[in-house]
Curated annotation (Swiss-Prot):
Record's catalysed reaction(s): cholest-4-en-3-one + 6 reduced [2Fe-2S]-[ferredoxin] + 3 O2 + 5 H(+) = (25S)-3-oxocholest-4-en-26-oate + 6 oxidized [2Fe-2S]-[ferredoxin] + 4 H2O
Disruption phenotype annotation: Cells lacking this gene show lower accumulation of 26-hydroxycholest-4-en-3-one and cholest-4-en-3-one-26-oate when compared with the wild-type and display a strong induction of cyp142A2. The levels of 26-hydroxycholest-4-en-3-one and cholest-4-on-3-one-26-oate are drastically reduced in cells lacking both cyp125A3 and cyp142A2.
Broad EC category: oxidoreductase
Cofactor(s) needed by this chain: heme
The species this protein was found in: Mycolicibacterium smegmatis (strain ATCC 700084 / mc(2)155)
One Gene Ontology term from the biological process aspect of the record: cholesterol catabolic process
Name of protein: Steroid C26-monooxygenase
Residues engaged in binding heme: 360
Record lineage: Bacteria, Bacillati, Actinomycetota, Actinomycetes, Mycobacteriales
Amino acid sequence: MPTPNIPSDFDFLDATLNLERLPVEELAELRKSEPIHWVDVPGGTGGFGDKGYWLVTKHADVKEVSRRSDVFGSSPDGAIPVWPQDMTREAVDLQRAVLLNMDAPQHTRLRKIISRGFTPRAIGRLEDELRSRAQKIAQTAAAQGAGDFVEQVSCELPLQAIAELLGVPQDDRDKLFRWSNEMTAGEDPEYADVDPAMSSFELISYAMKMAEERAVNPTEDIVTKLIEADIDGEKLSDDEFGFFVVMLAVAGNETTRNSITHGMIAFAQNPDQWELYKKERPETAADEIVRWATPVSAFQRTALEDVELGGVQIKKGQRVVMSYRSANFDEEVFEDPHTFNILRSPNPHVGFGGTGAHYCIGANLARMTINLIFNAIADNMPDLKPIGAPERLKSGWLNGIKHWQVDYTGAGKASVSGAPGTCPVAH
């Protein structure tokens, strides 16, 4: 049944719309009246060649699509649901080399190998080093007095965590930052002069060179673990490792840094929560920050056969877009979902991909990184205040902030609008 207040061609993945705001009210309307909604894209969709997609808005349905990898596949069209109009089908097909865009059995094999580097023990070994780095990041930024929170704070620890995990020299972290930005921000005018394909090629080449070096000189880092054969003879080839690093650079940098930025914006808008955090440092804060931010607004699957979802008939080959943003604010799952509550528990958000085979392999690393950097912010710049509005990334699927000017000392005049508990920044 069509939703009267939403035109059939209202495109929830429109990057221009998302530059200004997220479609919060429209998603809320769909959750109530048409939880699985067909979106017409009369002009066609770049890279896919179809004329629309199914948008899934309810928490339960998003989890069902995530769980049912037997009927909702990642391989046919990949996980990223929107590309620039000039994207070719051939370029989309190349994305299948990335773990995110694979189905079993290839996905099962690669994920088993990659999981070696993300065990609790492997992540735990990084904690002391990353805690020290988080403190240094916050202290360095605080000494500047004021600056761009994204560049000076929120991007730094995720980048350094990746560098530490992979054994990448810290001097090369800016390359990772640049490459990951250029690969994911093709629609944003700030990156209009870059070629995402070239950035991907440069990062893959860099990673393959790392793999070659570790094959000759093995160390204790994750690179060696992944390229050395286990007892079953399984290992990553150099090109498989290269594509894994592409995924890690995007997932580890873009999503975690955007969670950190949105989290600090939420604290600025909800000073009572910031005071609570500074006093108690609750472990539950990281998951609420991820829920609130939902840094990946949406991923997609493709129906592998005719299937019914939530009473709606979906045809084989149709794309099914999971709105993580909508699911994370589902009133049937979260009490007062539009209230930022760092003590929220339980918190079954889908910010790490819901459930199933594609659940975020680095979720524990992300939680640890978020906790460590906010502890460091609370220790070294407890009175931080915004002095400019956040500058959003133009993207149809990433909920990104490119720049945000703040006063680390708290001496400047705050300029983030909105009453506590509201969402004026369209996070």
